[in-house]
Swiss-Prot record:
UniProt-listed SMART domains: LRR_TYP (SM00369), S_TKc (SM00220)
Active site positions, chain numbering: 882 (proton acceptor)
Top-level taxonomy: Eukaryota, Viridiplantae, Streptophyta, Embryophyta, Tracheophyta
InterPro entries xref list: Kinase-like_dom_sf, Leu-rich_rpt, Leu-rich_rpt_typical-subtyp, LRR_dom_sf, LRR_N_plant-typ, LRR_R13L4/SHOC2-like, Prot_kinase_dom, Protein_kinase_ATP_BS
GO CC annotation terms, alphabetical: plasma membrane
Residue ranges of every copy of the Protein kinase domain listed in the record: 758-1040
Residues carrying sugar: 43, 107, 263, 359, 420, 434, 455, 606, 653
Modification Phosphotyrosine occurs at: 829, 869, 932
Summary of the knockout phenotype: Smaller root meristem size and fewer root meristematic cortex cells, associated with shorter roots and a slighty reduced sensitivity to RGF1. Insensitivity of pollen tubes to CLE43 and, partially, to CLE45 peptides-mediated growth stimulation. Pollen tubes of plants missing both SKM1 and SKM2 are fully insensitive to CLE45 peptides. Quintuple mutants rgi1 rgi2 rgi3 rgi4 rgi5 display a consistent short primary root phenotype with a small size of meristem associated with a total insensitivity to RGF1 and undetectable levels of PLT1 and PLT2.
Name used for this protein in its record: Leucine-rich repeat receptor-like serine/threonine-protein kinase RGI4
Encoding gene (name): RGI4
Chain segments annotated as transmembrane: 703-723
Tissue and organ expression note: Expressed in floers, pollen grains and stipules. Present in roots.
UniProt source species: Arabidopsis thaliana
Length: 1090
């Protein structure tokens, strides 16, 4: 029978195809079994891999599995699962066909198995965003076909192996946000195909960027930010013809930017900020026609800004601030049509603002403050209709504020303070509906405040003080419902304070002092007010009873006016009042007893130069926190016994009254100069000796009516007084000439009582300037006595006296007195029995409060209150300079007291604008304690109160984690701040960093701790200007316990209600910096270190 050729051919195909398909069937089963075995070794929670079943013969249909055209497993891709354990690799070795292994965000721990190096077909290995530790195994670098290696966001340690050069096909290498150390291997130059290299966020990565990096000719992204790379950028970087992003910010680079950078013609983003780069900006950058973002701020760049930058048409962000640049702002910047942000603050630029900038119609941020720019503001600025921020404060600008500025209807903040501007404020400025901040203080502006101000309904902060403004305060100001802060002091305003001001329902701060205002105080004022200064005007009438409704008021200054009548008793409802100054007015009647019912009255009470009669109210004995009392130049009578127990009094003036009787026999009154007692003809000094102290017999002496009339008597009294004081303190006649003693409280002891107890057995601590002893005096009272390290410690000794001797706060250690001679300097404080916060946290403290969150919260809130008082309530402000857990002492109920003011500094307000004190003075950096010092201590940057804020943030982290900032157990010798930052950058559970003694608490308590963690991160921002002010920190901490508990922990760790302070994390390719200067936030760094 003849054969059919077609039929034979069909049988042939059928036979061979059955052979072809029969072989993989066994192979697939084998790979399926290997995968099931691998799954069994994973600690998987839930049913994430429920589709992986032995009953399914074909694994190609399983979740996360892909096969090639031959039915072999080629890809394993599993994401966002919870494996909770190490990565097993033994079974994976059997899947030789595997080309892609991606296990991201699956909570892998342990080390990377070296067996992965046997997967010879592997092209993609992605183990990012896990908790892998240990070193990168060298075996990985045997995978010659590997194109993508992603190991970022883990806890990997060790060095980057030099075998990296074997991966000649590698296209993408991401190692960022680990704990890698050592240098970048020179073998990286072998990777000719490498397009992406990101190893930022490895703080211990050091050495120089190798020259060989220039051999990576395919490189598109080079990200090595937030490392310890040092030295110069190699000139070979110019060989990277395809590179689009170079991110090497927040490192230790030095030397100049190489001219060869101009050869990188594809470059779009250059981020070199926060280094120590010197030299000038290369002219060759003008060749970078695709450049979009140029961030070089906070370096040591000098010379002129090259005109050639104006030939980079794609530029939209230029930040060269905080350098040493000189010369003019290039006119060529007007050729940049896409420019959105130009930040040149804090340099030494001169010349004028170029009119050509008006061509940059997309400009949103123009910040040129803190330079030496002169001339007028060009009228063409009105063409910048997209402008939202215009900061030009602290320059030498002259002329008028151009009316055309009102055409910039998107403006939100204008700060032209500290210039020489003149003329009137353009009416049109108040037609800018989005304007929230208008700061024009310290100029020569004149004219009237226009009624148009009422149209500016979003205005939040208005500072016009220190000008020559005249006329009335317009009634339309009452339309500003959002106004929080108004300062129009030191002008020439007249007329009444408009009653419409009561409509400013958000108002907290009002300063109108030193004007010519008349009329009375409005009967109704905003209940939100915290600060009122109307002193040095011509206001009349009586105080309205409505003053009692201001329950948030802390400071009220009405001095140097013409007020009359009696003080309303309703003032006692001002329960937060700390300072009350009614001096130099025409008040009459008796001082109301109700003033003694204000427990917060601690800073000052001034009722001098009025017509008060009667006696000092008996309730004044309750003002135990009061520091300064002035009732001089009145018609007060009676005795002064009611003041005898005011132990916190530092200053008292009762002169020119009609007081009589015996002066209280206390040390404070015995030390008062006669000038504060004079013209009280019925007043006399006690003749009774003090118990236990040898005294010279004195006759009763009438206090003189006038120093001029009884000059000789005064001199005799002063001489006797001086001798008696020295004799009482020392108890030794032979030491009368050697010791200088000042006591602020009544203390019965001799110098010998103190000195003999300064032994090693009584040491309770050490500070930055001395050692502290516990000393019990004969009366049984226990003191803390600090002995300065050496007689050369004059600065620290004087700092303690000058600072603590003039301030009072419930959370600041109380200085009881001091003494010194040529060889010894001693300071006397209240003794606090529970040691320091440091000893409480780290095992040596008394009591069991160390593990209690509520106690820790109260401690840090108290310290925040103390620092806020120093920074914002003291005039001038005070910097502590050494905030650390050791300097936070604990009272009998574990209440906190800030101590050790040996490094404290008085801060001049010169050069400060809008309360932003990030640039207060040019003094050299302060000393501090290692581990707590802010980054600016390591450079020539200004040290400000924001440095205290950083140290406070470290203390917060110490309280939350229970770890010392330099805890030797932190991996890789990391600092506490970096350890926490790395943990959170790895998107790990923030609860894991909490002190084990704090974990396992109820959800509301955990919420509090996580929110406090968010506050601490604001405090430890690398840039001082990014850190909040202490008064805002207090507000945030107080708000935490009233926080909406429905918010998620992830929201809170990003800032919670504090997020208005949080720098917005953006990948570098999308960075648009936020303003510095007058605002309190600025671009800091990307959340993803590149």
């Amino acid at each position: 029978m003849p054969r059919n050729p077609r039929f034979c051919f069909f049988l042939f195909l059928l036979f061979h195809s059955s052979l072809f398909f029969s072989i993989p069937c066994f192979s697939i089963d084998e790979q399926g079994l290997a995968l099931l075995s691998w799954k069994s070794q994973l600690n998987i929670s839930g049913d994430a891999l429920s589709s992986w079943k032995a009953s399914e013969s074909n694994p190609c249909q399983w979740v996360g599995i892909k096969c090639n055209e031959r039915g072999q497993v080629s890809e394993i891709q599993l994401q966002v699962m919870d494996f909770q354990g190490p990565l097993p690799a033994t079974n994976l070795r059997q899947i030789k066909s595997l080309t892609l292994l991606s296990l991201t965000s699956v909570n892998l721990t342990g080390s990377i198995p070296k067996e992965l190096g046997d997967l010879s077909e592997l092209e993609v290995l992605d183990l990012a965003d896990n908790s892998l530790s240990g070193e990168i195994p060298v075996d990985i670098f045997k995978l010659k076909k590997l194109k993508i290696l992603s190991l970022n966001t883990n806890n990997l340690e060790g060095v980057i192996p030099s075998e990296l050069g074997n991966l000649v096909n590698l296209i993408e290498l991401t190692l960022f946000d680990n704990k890698l150390a050592g240098e970048i291997p020179r073998t990286i130059g072998e990777l000719k195909n490498l397009e992406i290299f990101r190893a930022g966020g490895n703080k211990n990565l050091r050495g120089e960027l190798p020259w060989e990096i220039g051999n990576c000719e395919s490189l598109v992204t080079l990200g090595l930010a937030e490392t310890s790379l040092s030295g110069r950028l190699p000139a070979s970087i110019g060989n990277l013809k395809k590179v689009q992003t170079i991110a090497l910010y927040t490192s230790l680079l030095s030397g100049p930017i190489p001219d060869e950078i101009g050869n990188c013609t594809e470059l779009q983003n250059l981020y070199l900020y926060q280094n120590s780069i010197s030299g000038s900006i290369p002219v060759s950058m003008g060749r970078l026609k695709k450049l979009q973002s140029l961030l070089l701020w906070q370096n040591n760049l000098v010379g002129k800004i090259p005109t050639e930058l104006g030939t980079c048409p794609e530029l939209f962000l230029v930040d060269l601030s905080e350098n040493l640049l000189t010369g003019n702002i290039p006119r060529s910047f007007g050729n940049l049509p896409n420019l959105q942000e130009l930040q040149l603050s804090v340099n030494q630029l001169s010349g004028t603002i170029p009119e050509e900038l008006a061509n940059c119609t997309k400009l949103t941020h123009l910040e040129i403050d803190n330079n030496q720019i002169s001339g007028e503001i060009p009228p063409l600025i009105g063409k910048l209709t997209s402008l939202t921020m215009f900061f030009a404060w602290q320059n030498q600008l002259t002329g008028i504020i151009p009316e055309s500025l009102s055409q910039c209807q998107e403006l939100q903040a204008i700060d032209l303070s500290y210039n020489n501007l003149s003329g009137s404020i353009p009416n049109g400025i108040f037609e800018i509906r989005n304007l929230t901040k208008l700061l024009l203080l310290s100029n020569y502006l004149s004219g009237f405040i226009p009624p148009d101000i009422g149209n500016c309904t979003n205005l939040y902060r208005l500072r016009l003080n220190g000008n020559r403004l005249a006329g009335n305060i317009p009634a339309e100001i009452g339309n500003l419902k959002n106004l929080n802060f108004i300062d129009i002091s030191e002008n020439r305003l007249i007329g009444n304070i408009p009653p419409e001001i009561s409509g400013c329902t958000s108002l907290e701060f009002v300063d109108l002092h030193s004007n010519g205002l008349t009329g009375g105080l409005p009967g109704t004022l905003p209940k939100s007010l915290q600060f009122i200064d109307l002193s040095d005007n011509s206001l009349t009438g009586s105080l309205p009873t409505g003053i009692g409704s201001l329950t948030e008021l802390t400071k009220l200054n009405l001095a140097k006016n013409r007020f009359s009548g009696e003080i309303p008793r309703e003032i006692s409802s001002c329960r937060s009042l700390q300072l009350l100054n009614l001096g130099d007015n025409g008040f009459t009647g008796e001082i109301p007893n109700e003033l003694g019912r204000i427990p917060s009255l601690a800073i000052s009470l001034n009722l001098s130069c009025n017509h008060f009669t009667g006696e000092i109210p008996s309730r004044f004995s309750s003002l135990t926190n009061l520091g300064t009392l002035d009732v001089s130049h009145n018609k007060l009578a009676g005795n002064l016994n009611v003041l005898a127990d005011l132990q916190n009094l530092v200053s008292l003036n009762i002169s020119f009254n009609e007081f009589s009787g015996e002066l209280p026999n206390t040390l404070f009154f015995r030390k008062l100069p006669l000038s504060v007692l004079e013209s009280n003809k019925g007043l006399f000094i006690s003749t009774r000796p003090e118990n236990g102290i040898q005294t010279r017999h004195r006759s009763a002496v009438k206090v003189t009516m006038s120093i001029l009339v009884a000059a000789s008597v005064v001199l005799v009294l002063m001489a006797v007084y001086t001798l008696v004081k020295a004799q009482r303190i020392t108890g030794k006649q032979e030491e009368l000439d050697s010791w200088e003693v000042t006591l602020y409280q009544k203390l019965d002891f001799s110098i010998d009582d103190i000195v003999k107890n300064l032994t090693s057995a009584n040491v309770i601590g050490t500070g930055s300037s001395g050692v502290v002893y516990r000393v019990t005096i004969p009366s049984g009272e226990t003191l803390a006595v600090k002995k300065m390290w050496s007689k050369e410690e004059n600065r620290a000794f004087n700092s303690e006296i000058n600072t603590l001797g003039s301030i009072r706060h419930r959370n600041i250690i109380r200085l009881l007195g001091w003494c010194s001679n040529r060889n010894l300097k001693l300071l006397f404080y209240d003794y606090l029995p529970n040691g320091s916060l440091s000893s409480l946290l780290h095992g040596a403290g008394k009591g069991s409060g160390g593990a209690d969150w509520e106690a820790r919260y109260d401690v840090v809130l108290g310290v925040a209150h103390a620092l806020a008082y120093l920074h914002h309530d003291c005039l001038p402000p005070i910097l502590h300079g050494d905030v650390k857990a050791m300097n936070v002492l604990l009272g009998s109920r574990f209440e906190s007291y800030l101590a050790d003011f040996g490094l404290a500094k008085i801060v001049s307000g010169e050069g400060v604008t809008d309360g932003d004190s990030s640039k207060l003075s040019n003094r050299p950096p302060l000393a501090g304690s290692y581990g707590y010092m802010a980054p600016e201590h390591a450079s020539m940057q200004h040290i400000t109160e924001k440095s205290d804020v950083y140290s406070y943030g470290v203390v917060l982290l110490e309280v939350l984690t229970g770890k010392h900032p330099l805890d030797p157990d932190l991996p890789g010798g990391a600092h506490l701040v970096q350890w926490v930052r790395d943990h959170l950058a790895g998107k790990k559970d923030p609860r894991e960093i909490l002190d084990p003694r704090l974990r396992g608490r109820a959800d509301p308590i955990m919420h509090e701790m996580l929110q406090t963690l968010a506050v601490s991160f604001l405090c430890v921002s690398n840039k001082a200007s990014d850190r909040p002010m202490m008064k805002d920190i207090v507000a945030m901490l107080k708000e935490i316990r009233q926080f909406d508990m429905d918010r998620s922990e992830s929201d809170m760790i990003k800032g919670g209600k504090c997020e208005k302070w949080q720098p917005q994390p953006l990948p570098p390719e999308k960075i648009v910096s936020t303003p510095r200067g007058s605002s309190n936030c600025s671009f800091a760094y990307s959340d993803e270190s590149v």
